[in-house]
């Protein structure tokens, strides 16, 4: 999707061509690592990232390219080319996500962009369609993305599946210290302790992404060198949570805090509150249903709830075969018409049967159905973000 921003392409002036000439020369194909600089330049243009902004966090253009190179080699990147110039692109990272205790192959959609002079030509729709077909071939039954335009992705079949809560806590509102059996240890941000803590958390958390080296590389990309981490270990010396943070201008910034239980949550907030004399407030984001204000003695903190990830079922039949429905004393059946604006394999009339044990099966049917649902609603419902009324 094209975004009209500042003139030029990261210092490069785009050649002015007519729309008809563009169409004649355009070709969709995989984007190899030899196009890494063009790939990065297009992202920089679309998201309006300047050299000054990169330098402010200690990054240089070449460092970004080197950091992105291993990720791009493993990703499925496709784009439109005008002769040999990359003008529109999407990237899909091979990932895994935990969905109600099951591990699903997931496609992480990112790197989406089109130069403005090539917008309104249907290029991105065709790229997304091909990317989804590739995901289906790779067995990736669901796709996650972090949207810059919720309405646009809704039209293509994605829907909100999680929220982000941004909060501000004044120093005098920090929770009081409470005794816990474990302890908090500061660790190397690139060490195995942090990964072990996250793996324990992700395996038991619905919707969490299982991070391999590729995912960790993306997670850290763009962070400053000042970022730090601390892990909470329980009395059995098992990592039950962590906080990733940095301190600047008397503000304790929390990039991420995860915990498996109340003990770990308390221990990590004890650690944050121990910085009381160094800071004026704490700012951070949380991506869970944690009732943060409720858990504080002074609950009058600032919280802003905003959409976070969007998700999309890629292959409905395959997704249902793996999905753990709740057991019941009765077999269940639902007949409905499913609508998908992009994937033909998901369009049509279906019968969903669920056994008493919670195993689902979907078959196509020819008979007309009174109920109708689109893939967006089906996704957010099965992901547990919204329940049917």
Range-by-range predicted roles:
Residues 137-141, 147-165, 267, 289-305:
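Conserved active-site alpha-helix within GNAT-family acetyltransferase domains
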Residues 13-14:
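Cationic, low-complexity basic patches in intrinsically disordered or flexible, solvent-exposed regions
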Residues 109-133, 262-273:
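Conserved acetyl-CoA-binding loop-helix of GNAT-fold acetyltransferases
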Residues 128, 133-147, 277-287:
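Conserved GNAT acetyl-CoA-binding A-motif
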Residues 43, 50-97, 206-229, 321-324:
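Active-site rim helix/loop that mediates acceptor-substrate recognition in acyltransferases
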Residues 9, 20-37, 48-50, 181-389:
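Intrinsically disordered, low-complexity, positively biased terminal segments
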Residues 1-10:
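Long amphipathic alpha-helical segments used for membrane anchoring, targeting, substrate engagement
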Residues 77-79, 85-95, 108, 113, ...:
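Conserved beta-strand in the GNAT
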């Amino acid at each position: 999707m094209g975004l009209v921003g500042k003139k030029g392409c990261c210092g490069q002036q785009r050649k002015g061509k007519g729309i008809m000439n563009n169409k004649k020369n355009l070709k969709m194909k995989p984007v190899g690592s030899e196009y890494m600089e063009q790939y990065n330049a297009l992202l920089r243009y679309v998201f309006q990232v300047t050299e000054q902004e990169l330098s402010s966090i200690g990054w240089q253009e070449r460092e970004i390219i080197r950091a992105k190179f291993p990720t791009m080699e493993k990703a499925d990147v496709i784009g439109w080319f005008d002769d040999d110039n990359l003008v529109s692109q999407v990237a899909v990272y091979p990932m895994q996500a935990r969905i109600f205790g099951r591990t699903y192959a997931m496609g992480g959609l990112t790197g989406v962009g089109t130069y403005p002079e090539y917008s309104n030509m249907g290029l991105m729709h065709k790229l997304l369609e091909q990317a989804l077909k590739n995901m289906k071939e790779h067995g990736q039954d669901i796709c996650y993305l972090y949207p810059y335009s919720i309405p646009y992705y809704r039209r293509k079949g994605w829907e909100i599946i999680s929220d982000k809560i941004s909060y501000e806590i004044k120093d005098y509102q920090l929770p009081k210290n409470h005794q816990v059996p474990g302890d908090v240890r500061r660790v190397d941000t690139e060490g195995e302790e942090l990964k072990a803590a996250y793996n324990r958390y992700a395996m038991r958390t619905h919707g969490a992404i299982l991070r391999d080296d590729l995912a960790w590389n993306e997670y850290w990309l763009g962070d400053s060198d000042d970022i730090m981490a601390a892990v909470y270990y329980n009395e059995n010396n098992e990592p039950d949570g962590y906080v990733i943070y940095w301190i600047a201008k008397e503000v304790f910034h929390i990039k991420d805090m995860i915990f498996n239980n109340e003990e770990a949550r308390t221990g990590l907030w004890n650690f944050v509150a121990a910085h009381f004399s160094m800071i004026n407030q704490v700012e951070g984001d949380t991506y869970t249903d944690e009732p943060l204000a409720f858990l504080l003695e002074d609950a009058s903190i600032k919280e802003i709830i905003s959409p976070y990830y969007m998700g999309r079922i890629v292959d409905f039949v395959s997704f249902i075969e793996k999905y753990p429905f709740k057991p019941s004393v009765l077999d269940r059946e639902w007949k409905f018409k499913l609508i998908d604006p992009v994937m033909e394999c998901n369009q049509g009339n279906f019968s969903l049967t669920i056994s008493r044990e919670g195993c689902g099966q979907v078959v196509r049917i020819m008979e007309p159905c009174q109920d109708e649902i689109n893939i967006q609603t089906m996704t957010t419902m099965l992901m547990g973000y919204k329940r049917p009324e």
